[in-house]
């Protein structure tokens, strides 16, 4: 079992969350499209050669983002990452994937 985390501009969060669930992540027992979100501020500065959706080259940018977390089976990770990248507006999609411990330590 894995946890997939994506950082998404707030205005795009519902679209990305739906894509994640449609790809098969976020299944907990008899529930699907399950996720947890928190809001925060994302910061970045586009470098020369970037094609930013938001902001300008060499100018620091701040944007309100949602951290979307979902549980994901190993066989759904590739489809989930593909779905996130397809629905996400950023050129470089901020993603984290963690393997979860299967038993209590």
Sequence positions of predicted segments:
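Hydrophobic structural segments
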Residues: 1-105
